Structures are given as structure tokens and as C-alpha cells.
């Protein structure tokens, strides 16, 4: 058995997702963390923020050329939208076979990149070195809708609520705990980037209405689906059970999942399956941790896939 190790760098390591990635890498037997780039923490030791990492590795403030000069096997870009391109260009020029996993939305509409939602797109992976990690809401939406794709009579209507960690670490109304207290904050109620992302991936128009809540982590996504033929609840449940059979990170529940029960867990739960009278409308609920299955855990699945390692290595399940 090949037990070679691979070198990895993380760009954007200070954020919530970067912190979760570092925990997963610390538990990985075949990944060596070669560098972590963070402008705000440059010069600080990684072990001071992540005790699971012992040693002298320090955060560095690396531009695209400096990242490329490191010559690592793989790079995870955990940057805000719009910042990935210079890093991708520099890595391609310096070492074209570098595996790049990008967590932003920058390449989710680029067909030359593998769109990595393994439970749904694993069959499309054929050695691509560039992997676009799906959005957190987009992951939940697709898991809730995909098993019923051929039954849809119209656009899925998806009401989403996320914890405020989804708004990142840069201060804004959407992560201001005082403004969020006892509140639910709607935003980007049409044309959200995840609405466009899911519409492209599923090949059907999706209507998505996101909200931010006062809890820190976790997404609940309620999908209202009109069907083109009458279904029983048993038929609906069977579709989901068959779709996610053998997928350790996807749990199909009879009851509607709670976001409080998924926080800190690496998988997703799908359930509820409530049929309206007449059998041609069903409501499905999906939950996941936006920092884990919605970001870091999925990135680790994709990285493992690209490096030829068992997909769930270092992921508790």
C-alpha cells in the first residue's frame, strides 16, 4: 500500500473555514502542512492558535508568487470571492500539476474545473487538478433536491437560514451579534450566487431566499418542491435512501433534522419529507454545518480524491 505523504499549503488560514481545515490536516496521516498564509497573523506560531500542531510553523503573509514558489503538492484557497485568480495563475505557471481546491465561488461556473460535491459529482472526477468547492447553501440545496430532479414540475423554492459564521470574520451586519440577537436577517433574496450555482448544477431554475440567524454555525434549508406526478411519502423516502445509500456523510432521517444537532458534525442530514394533500408537492429539510460539510470537510473529501487517498481520511464519520 502506498503511504507517501503530500505537502499542502492553505491560503486564507485565519478565517473560520481555515481553522477547521487546519484541524482536519492535523489529523491526516498523509498530509504535511508546509505553509499557512494569513496577512493578519503573519509571524505568529500556528501552535499558539492550534495546539494540535506542535512545532515552529508560523503564519506567513504570502502573495501569489510566494505561494507558487513553495512548490507544494496541493494548495487550498480559503479566500473571499474574487481573490483566487492570481494564485491560480501563479501556481499554473510554476507547477501545473499542483492540486488546487478553491473554496470561493470564483470557479464554480468554469467547466474546466471539477465541481466537487462528491456524493453527487464523484462520477465526473477523472483526474482534474483544479477543484471548485461548492457553496455551503448550495450543498444543502442540491442534497435536498437532487433525488427528485426528474419529478420536478417547477422551480424548487428554498428557504435557508445560516449561522453567522457564514458571513466570515470581516465585521458586517450579518455577523454582528448585537444586531442578530432575537433576529433573523434576510439578504440577497434573489440572484444569490448560490441560487445561480445550484441552477447551473441541477439544470433547473432554483429560487433561493437566504437568512442569517443568531447562532454561530449550521444551516437549515427547507425546500418546497412541486412534482409532475403523484407520489406517496414512501416513494419519496425510498428515493432519498437509494440516492445516499453507502454515503457515510449523508444521513436520511424520517423526521425533519434540527440545525442544533448538526453543528460540529462533518456530514449532512436530510429529512422531513412532508407531502401536501394530493401528493404533488413535498417539503424536504436539509441541515449541515456550513464550516464543515459546507466548506472544510468537503474540501478535504475533494483533496483526498485528487491525491488518490481514501476520500474520508481524517474526516470523523
From Swiss-Prot:
It is found in: Cytoplasm. Its main location: cytoplasm. Pfam families: Semialdhyde_dh, Semialdhyde_dhC_1. GO terms for molecular function: N-acetyl-gamma-glutamyl-phosphate reductase activity; NAD binding; NADP+ binding. This is N-acetyl-gamma-glutamyl-phosphate reductase. Coiled coil: none annotated. It is an enzyme of class 1 (oxidoreductase). The active site is at 136. InterPro entries: AGPR_AS (IPR023013), AGPR_type-1 (IPR000706), NAD(P)-bd_dom_sf (IPR036291), NAGSA_dehydrogenase (IPR050085), Semialdehyde_DH_NAD-bd (IPR000534). Pathway: Amino-acid biosynthesis; L-arginine biosynthesis; N(2)-acetyl-L-ornithine from L-glutamate: step 3/4. One of its GO terms (biological process) is L-arginine biosynthetic process. It catalyses: N-acetyl-L-glutamate 5-semialdehyde + phosphate + NADP(+) = N-acetyl-L-glutamyl 5-phosphate + NADPH + H(+). Its EC number is 1.2.1.38. The keyword NADP applies. Catalyzes the NADPH-dependent reduction of N-acetyl-5-glutamyl phosphate to yield N-acetyl-L-glutamate 5-semialdehyde. Belongs to the NAGSA dehydrogenase family. Type 1 subfamily. The keyword Amino-acid biosynthesis applies. Keywords: Amino-acid biosynthesis, Arginine biosynthesis, Cytoplasm, NADP, Oxidoreductase. GO terms for cellular component: cytoplasm. It comes from Stenotrophomonas maltophilia (strain K279a). Gene3D superfamilies: Dihydrodipicolinate Reductase, domain 2 (3.30.360.10), NAD(P)-binding Rossmann-like Domain (3.40.50.720).
Amino acid at each position: 500500500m502506498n503511504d507517501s505523504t503530500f505537502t499542502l499549503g492553505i491560503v486564507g488560514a485565519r478565517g473560520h473555514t481555515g481553522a477547521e481545515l487546519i484541524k482536519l490536516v492535523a489529523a491526516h496521516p498523509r498530509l504535511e502542512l508546509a505553509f499557512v498564509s494569513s496577512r493578519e497573523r503573519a509571524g505568529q506560531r500556528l501552535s499558539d492558535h492550534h495546539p494540535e500542531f506542535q512545532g515552529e510553523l508560523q503564519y506567513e503573509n504570502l502573495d501569489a508568487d510566494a505561494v507558487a514558489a513553495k512548490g507544494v503538492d496541493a494548495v487550498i484557497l480559503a479566500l473571499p470571492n474574487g481573490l483566487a485568480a492570481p494564485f491560480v495563475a501563479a501556481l499554473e505557471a510554476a507547477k501545473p500539476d499542483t492540486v488546487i481546491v478553491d473554496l470561493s465561488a470564483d470557479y464554480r461556473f468554469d467547466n474546466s474545473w471539477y465541481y466537487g460535491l462528491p456524493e453527487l459529482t464523484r462520477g465526473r472526477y477523472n483526474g482534474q487538478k483544479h477543484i471548485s468547492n461548492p457553496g455551503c447553501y448550495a450543498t444543502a440545496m442540491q442534497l435536498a433536491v437532487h433525488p427528485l430532479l426528474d419529478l420536478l414540475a417547477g422551480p424548487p423554492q428554498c428557504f435557508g437560514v445560516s449561522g453567522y459564521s457564514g458571513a466570515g470574520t470581516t465585521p458586517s451586519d450579518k455577523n454582528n451579534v448585537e444586531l442578530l440577537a432575537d433576529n433573523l436577517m434576510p439578504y440577497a433574496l434573489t440572484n444569490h450566487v448560490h441560487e445561480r450555482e445550484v441552477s447551473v448544477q441541477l439544470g433547473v431554475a432554483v429560487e433561493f431566499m437566504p437568512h442569517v440567524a443568531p447562532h454561530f454555525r449550521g444551516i437549515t434549508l427547507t425546500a418546497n418542491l412541486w412534482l409532475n406526478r403523484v407520489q406517496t411519502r414512501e416513494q419519496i423516502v425510498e428515493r432519498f435512501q437509494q440516492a445516499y445509500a453507502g454515503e457515510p456523510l449523508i444521513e436520511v432521517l424520517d423526521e425533519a433534522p434540527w440545525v442544533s444537532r448538526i453543528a460540529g458534525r462533518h456530514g449532512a442530514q436530510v429529512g422531513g419529507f412532508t407531502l401536501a394533500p394530493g401528493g404533488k408537492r413535498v417539503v424536504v429539510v436539509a441541515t449541515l454545518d456550513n464550516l464543515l460539510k459546507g466548506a472544510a470537510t468537503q474540501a478535504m473529501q475533494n483533496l483526498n480524491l485528487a491525491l488518490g487517498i481514501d476520500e474520508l481520511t481524517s474526516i470523523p464519520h
